[in-house]
Structures are given as C-alpha cells and as structure tokens.
Amino acid sequence: FNSMAASLSKVETQRSEFTANVSHELKTPMTTISGFAEGILDGTIPPERERDSLEIIVSETRRLSRLVRRMLDLSRLNALTENITAQEQFDLTETVSQVLVSLEGKITGRDLDVDVKMPDEPLKVWGDPDSVTQVCYNLLDNAAKFAAKGTTITVQITKKDGKAYTSIRNLGATIPPDELSLLFDRFHKADYSRSMDREGVGLGLYIVKTILGNLKENITVTSEDGVTNFTFTLTLA
C-alpha cells in the first residue's frame, strides 16, 4: 500500500510540474503577441514600426504552434503503456531517408551537407514505425539546428549483435559534460543552446528517450571537440 501511495504521489507531482511548465511556456509567446497587437491598435507603436511588430507576432504565433504540437506529442507519449506491444517489422533505411527528405529545406537553408552511410539493401528492424520516425526526425532536426553552418551531418547505420545502431553526428558547439546527463530531461534546455535555439521548448530529446525506453531500446550521446554524436538502438528483425 505504501509503495502504491508513493507511486501515486510521484505521478501527481510530475503532473503538477508538467502543468506549471506548460503554463509558463505558453504564456511567453502569448504575452508577446498580445503586447504587440495592443500596441498597434492603441497607437503606442508608430506606423513605421508596425511591419516589424507584425513580423514578431507572426514569428511568435509559429512558435506557439510548434509548442502546442510538442505538447500533443508529449500527451500522446503519456498515454502509451510502459511497454509497446504492437511492434512490427519495417525498413529503417527507408524511414531515415524519408525524414531526411522532409528536412531538406532546413538542411539546405543552413548550407549543410549530409553524409549518409547506410546499407543499400532494406534493413528490417522491430518497432513502431511512426514512433521511430519521430525519433529520427527529432534527432536530425536537432543536428540541423545546432550544426555549424557549412558543415556536414553524418548519418550512419551499422549492425552488431542483433541490433541496428543509428548514429547522427554534427559539428558545432561542444555540449558541456555536466549537461549531457540532463539532455533527455523534460523541458531541459542547456545553457549553450538557449542563445542558439530560442524556438525550442526542451521536449524533443525527452520524446526521443521516452519512445526508445518504451521500445526497450537505448540511446547514448557524446560531445567532444565540437563533435556531437547521438546513437540509438533498434532490434534487428
């Protein structure tokens, strides 16, 4: 009974923290949007600055949309059982290729190259295809976001001991050692990333970790001399 009570208390604490974090994250863009909109309407913002103000409103609206989308992703994760039982076989190389295509605009927009090292033939793994697609998207989006402009993102898939290892490597700022263990915490944003990523809300890597945990898989990260590498596992079919 005491164990159950402690577990329920922990869940309630996490729920309260989640609600507080959501309220804070939503309030920031809404306050900005409201402030600039009211400034335009009441004349506080002069006509010559209205366009700049509208651009800020549009930017914050998009950020709010991204935030809501992340919250929905998180809500979907919270609804998952601890073990995902409805796993199926799918081609990991095809999944990675499709995600790269969807991020092509962002990658080329930052003048990045992509070096893909994957088997030519289909590589079948076990998992939930939609969830693994989300994992690949979040990691590749993260790499594109923090890679130094004009550098190369390396995507490599290898096989060993019944597992497929997918590594995503980018060149950029080194993540401090004391931050590495916190990267996968919900709503955590490393100090080094705050100035580089004003749009993120600290959920992307948490979602990755949660999905892989539900699949009973693993993810590791290293960051040395400007090279950051994320590697996650999936079970070969």
Outline where the language-model segments fall:
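Amphipathic coiled-coil signaling helices used for dimeric signal transmission
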Residues: 1-14
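Short alpha-helical segment of the dimerization/phosphotransfer core of two-component systems
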Residues: 59-65
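Short conserved segment of the HATPase_c
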Residues: 175-189
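Conserved glycine-rich
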Residues: 216-217
